[in-house]
Swiss-Prot record, chain B:
This is Ras-related protein RABG3f. GTP binds at residues 15-23, 63-67, 125-128, 158-159. The keyword Acetylation does not apply. InterPro entries: P-loop_NTPase, Small_GTP-bd, Small_GTPase. One of its GO terms (cellular component) is plasma membrane. Interacts with VPS35A. GO terms for biological process: intracellular protein transport; late endosome to vacuole transport; vacuole organization. It comes from Arabidopsis thaliana.
């Protein structure tokens, strides 16, 4: 870890580091896989094109620019793009060497370039924006001596370049499908460009749900128009006649500054990683370069953000209330950190021309590759990172969820897990026998049992019955759910049964498809979330309190608004937290969100950052309409089904990173789903009989 | 006194889990019944415009989670209530026995200015089930309880079929309105709610 920190420090200090060591910038612009080999492309690379005086603008002031040299090189028939800033030649003293190294582009292969957008105004400088297939985009590269056309012509000689049918200024590299256009169009800012209807937003979930994408793209036309009507009107000093380039520059400069501040902070604190939750110091931290690679992403992220918000609100009314600015200085801009999601783990192995059973096997094989010969998960953090950034292909969930939930130990072998399953199966049967052996006569004298069973019976028949797995009369899975919950209420008699538990169990049973396995996964989950259901509701109150602290930290005007309007109890988020958004998303999306949260990758309390992310997206609506507690509760409840999962998770990730140690410090120790602090009475008993 | 007219009437529905609180609310507001309502988590409300004489009101009907351990949330949801609807299932003795708890808990948490005269309405739901053959709480027993609590109006309903739901809520709305007006006038003692008007299905004469 310290080695890595040192390296990064070097990189940030030495502008030419990246240029001389391909390693630095290669990782800076690391693709999603993060595994791109660090080619030594200069050794026998052929120089194809060289252009001097190509600059980027880290601030909105044209005078502040970083000039450099743009190059195309070719090696092994792969074309590479590089842009290296000139050493010690900034146009303005305010720009540090660090600024320059931030933007260095070293040998990005065109296999990773999705498109190039050119901008060649009659007046002003020409520039291009290079968008990677990951969705990242580099800042605009300004051709101070002109020559964009030649540059593109040169590229075209070496890679397949097709002009987008939607925008003649967009050139798609190696394109096959429309998702590219989505990315490209998402680069445009609705406030400064008339966006044609029919254009679509960036793919929402890495292609895992094409249906959703289609729906999204078909909706966009409407949303775009409403965004341009209302969403940006509140922005001060907005002048629709301003050139896009200036607008882009502004955005980038803000982001740049933000990135700089954050990274400076990052390095100035202990071990260079101070702003990341210390409790997670055994996990990989987002490396400095990796973060930077996200800078350019804010374009599409912001626009999607706007769409989503507008989509949520559906209301084109212009708010006349002056909503205080977001304290995170750049509001939405700061929310650009979240990395784009990958396809679910195991997704690449999915093919449509093979039977489900083979699909399942292949998915399993993919997972198996992460295990050593005896079945241990070699690098649990790598697994958790992979899941965090893309979820799990459904067939694979059954293998992975028990690890995430803590039922299986990561370092257990195949044999140990097999043994565990058989032991646990017997144990489950014994527990189940405890209530099954209660005779009707005994039950008459066992009020607690009768009432508990009655409550469970009532709830299982109204849990996800519209979902295929549980639908229909005399559904066996509903019976299994009942048996598991009743058994659990004997396993953990003090906690018993509480409404909301069936919401948790339902997807677990659907995934595990085995009563005993589902039971033990549920037990593992309740080890962390049991306090949500305590009689004293303490677990809930702690989380709501932590949420209020996080909002105070990450959005003080919104916090103050809640304070003034007597909303600080955050009860309007009760359902979100109690069952971790189960009622807010459709079934599949809920499972995706859960597995992401269960990784505890950035924080054990990622769900709280998800809450902040959603609230933040709605802040202008909430404050603009001056919602009182009742209206707010209703509004939040009605968000159900209208929250975009992918962008929300990315926002949450951004917020979590941004909050850093301060965020972690806002969350009291022992707050669920942290494991309980002590082994005392976990579930305090009061007079409640159930 | 047009300026002091209340336009929002807040009603809270309480009762054990599964007695049909959500169904009653939806039947009244949306004239719909579904077998697929999920257990209510937290709280939610629906609104409905109601008219009395020439005045229009918004009835805000709060539906809450029925499990006892969520009662501590009531503090946030009950405040400012104008009427409390207690619901039990005529086929469940337990849900009837718990009415006292619900009533007391409400009075503690909502802490209305005049708890003695705060308007409650009792609803015995699910009278349609098994054509009444599985019924365990008699009408007589329910009315006796109502009488003991200051003559609470009582209705027997079927949220599924829609029986008596409209009537019950009209009474609820009237009670809420009266309660709201009392509060405004700061004359809680001048209104006598204690007169006997608890006849089943006839609505309340308040």
């Amino acid at each position: 870890m310290s080695m890595e920190a040192t390296e990064l420090q070097d990189l940030s200090d030495d502008a030419d580091y990246a240029a001389s060591q391909q390693q630095g910038s290669a990782s800076m612009m690391r693709s999603d896989s993060g595994k791109r080999s660090l080619q030594s492309e200069h050794e026998d690379a052929v120089l194809i094109y060289l252009k001097d005086n190509v600059a980027i603008h880290p601030t909105q002031f044209a005078s502040e620019r970083i000039s450099g040299r743009l190059k195309l090189t070719k090696q092994d028939s792969v074309l590479f793009l590089s842009w290296i800033p000139y050493k010690g030649q900034t146009s303005n003293a305010k720009l540090s060497e660090k600024d320059r190294s931030l933007y260095t582009i070293t040998a990005v292969p065109f296999t990773e370039v999705r498109s190039i957008r050119r901008h060649t105004p009659a007046l002003g400088w020409q520039y291009v924006i290079v968008v990677l297939s990951s969705g990242l985009a580099f800042p605009p590269l300004y051709f101070y001596n002109g020559g964009v056309r030649e540059f593109l012509a040169m590229v075209k000689q070496h890679v397949f370049l097709a002009r987008s049918s939607e925008d003649q200024n967009v050139f798609i590299v190696n394109d096959f499908q429309s998702p590219l256009q989505r990315t490209l169009s998402s680069l445009e800012l609705p406030s400064s460009l008339p966006v044609a209807s029919g254009q679509s937003v960036y793919p929402l979930d890495g292609g895992s749900s094409s249906e959703n994408q289609r729906r999204t793209s078909s909706d966009v036309g409407n949303r775009v128009s409403s965004v341009s009507q209302s969403g940006f009107r509140k922005q001060k000093s907005h002048d629709p006649t301003r050139d896009l380039s200036i607008h882009l520059l502004e955005k980038f400069s803000l982001v740049t500054k933000f990135a700089r501040d954050t990274t400076t902070q990052l390095f100035s604190e202990n071990n260079g990683f101070g702003s990341i939750d210390k409790r997670w110091n055994n996990q990989p931290v987002h490396s400095y370069p990796e973060k930077l690679s996200n800078i350019a992403e804010e374009k599409h992220h912001e626009i999607r953000h706007s769409y989503s918000e507008n989509d949520l609100l559906k209301d084109d009314e212009i708010s006349y209330i002056d909503v205080p600015a977001d304290p995170l200085e750049f509001d939405k801009l700061s929310l650009m950190w979240g990395k784009p999601r990958q396809p679910p783990m195991g997704h690449k192995e999915r093919r449509n021309d093979i039977s489900p059973s083979i699909k399942c096997r292949i998915s399993t094989e993919y997972f198996t590759a992460l295990l050593d010969s005896e079945g241990r998960v070699v690098e649990s953090k790598a697994l958790r990172e992979r899941v965090f950034y893309g979820g799990i292909e459904h067939q694979l969930r059954r293998e992975v969820w028990p690890f995430l939930l803590g039922y299986y130990a990561y370092d257990s072998t195949y044999a140990e897990r097999e043994y565990l399953r058989s032991v646990k199966r017997m144990e489950y049967a014994t527990l189940k026998q405890q209530w099954q052996s209660i005779s009707p006569e005994q039950a008459k004298r066992f009020t607690k049992y009768r009432e508990r069973k009655g409550l469970i019976d009532k709830d299982v028949v109204r849990t996800d019955r519209a979902f295929e797995y549980y639908e229909g009369d005399d559904n066996l899975h509903v019976n299994s759910m009942r048996d598991i919950l009743l058994t659990y209420s004997f396993y953990n008699f003090d906690l018993g049964y509480c409404q909301g538990m069936s919401d948790y169990l339902s997807p677990i049973l659907f995934v595990m498809e085995d009563e005993s396995e589902s039971f033990w996964c549920f037990v593992a989950l309740m080890e962390r979330l049991g306090p949500n259901f305590n009689r004293d509701q303490n677990g809930m109150h702690t989380q709501l309190f932590a949420l209020s602290k996080l909002v105070e930290l990450l959005d003080s005007p919104l916090h103050n608004y809640f304070k003034e309007n007597d909303c600080l109890n955050y009860f309007f988020c009760f359902r979100w937290i109690l069952i971790q958004f189960k009622r807010e998303f459709e079934y599949e999306k809920t499972m995706q969100l859960w597995e992401v949260m269960w990784t505890h990758y950035l924080s054990e309390h990622f769900h709280l950052y998800v809450c902040v992310a959603v609230l933040k997206r709605c802040r202008s609506k909430i404050m603009g309409e001056q919602m009182d507690f009742d209206t707010l509760l209703k509004f939040i409840n009605e968000l159900s089904g209208h929250i975009d999962l992918d962008s929300t998770v990315r926002d949450a990730e951004a917020l979590c990173i941004e909050a850093g140690e301060n965020g972690a410090a806002s969350i009291p120790p022992g707050t669920p789903p942290s494991l309980p602090l002590d082994d005392g009475t976990l579930y305090p008993q009061e007079d409640d009989v159930l | 006194m047009p300026s002091r007219r209340r336009t929002l009437l807040k009603v809270i529905i309480l009762g054990d889990s599964g007695v049909g609180k959500t169904s009653l609310m939806n039947q009244y507001v949306n004239k719909k019944f579904s077998n697929q309502y999920k257990a209510t988590i937290g709280a939610d409300f629906l609104t409905k415009e109601v008219q009395f004489e020439d005045r229009l009101f918004t009835l805000q009907i709060w539906d809450t989670a029925g499990q006892e351990r969520f009662q501590s949330l009531g503090v946030a949801f009950y405040r400012g209530a104008d009427c409390c609807v207690l619901v039990y299932d005529v086929n469940s003795m337990k849900s009837f026995e718990n009415l006292n708890n619900w009533r007391e808990e409400f009075l503690i948490q909502a802490s209305p200015s005049d708890p003695e005269n705060f308007p409650f309405v009792l609803i015995g739901n699910k009278v349609d089930v098994d054509d009444g053959n599985s019924r365990v709480v008699s009408e007589k027993k329910a009315k006796a309880w109502c009488a003991s609590k200051g003559n609470i109006p009582y209705f027997e309903t079927s949220a599924k079929v829609g029986t008596n739901v409209e009537e019950a809520f009209q009474c609820i709305a009237k009670d809420a309105l009266k309660s709201g007006e009392e509060e405004e006038l700061y004359l809680p003692d001048t209104i006598d709610v204690g007169t006997s008007n608890q006849q089943r299905s006839t609505g309340c004469e308040c």
